[in-house]
Amino acid sequence: MLVEDVVILDFETTGLNPDRGDRVTEVAALRIRGNRIVESFESLVNCSVRVPDYISQFTGITQAMVDAAPAPALVIRQLLQFIGDDAVIAHNAGFDQLVLDSECRRLGLVNPLPDFICSVLIARCMFPDMKSHALGCLASHLGIPFAPGAHRAAVDATVTANILFRACDLIRTRFAVPRIDASVLRRIACAAQMAEISSAAISAA
């Protein structure tokens, strides 16, 4: 059980390269308190760009849905207000951080949030025997409901939250940590990242 609030964040986008013009189509943020979701923020986003057909097929987010959505100037500010001072956790956090940084720059804002905590790294530390730590693979391994082909922001964020709950249970028992907060999660993610760096260095030697 977490002893402080954290926010699970997920973006859907028009592609994987925000620095090359890919934009947000949807965002979801879930506030976690203890071992449950207590509050949520969710919105489609109209960035006045074309949604590629393959993205619509992948996510179910159509051009018409995006065209009818509020502009990023509103959504991003609402998102930052929702998050407040809470730590942010995301699956493949580097991507979500890049997306938010890019959208903030476009609005003339500085992203005020500290580095996100990556749930992929936490999962690699807590479930080391898995060959893949993709969201769907983790959900299947842990028995968490996750509809095949579901790639909407709120669905992905909810699955990430449930994976985090399972990871926290393991952290508490495996490491005898009675109070799990964002600093504990950040240390575990950093340890997993350093282990990967060490393995890569050894392999390259």
What are the residue ranges of the model-derived segments?
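Conserved non-catalytic scaffold segment of RNase H-like nuclease domains
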Residues: 1-114, 128-129, 133, 137-151
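A short, structured active-site edge motif that brings together acidic residues
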Residues: 113-124
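Acidic two-metal-ion nuclease catalytic site recognized across multiple nuclease folds
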Residues: 1, 161-205
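Acidic donor-binding loop at a coil-to-helix junction in glycosyltransferase catalytic cores
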Residues: 155
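Generic recognition of well-ordered alpha-helical segments
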Residues: 122, 138, 159, 163-166
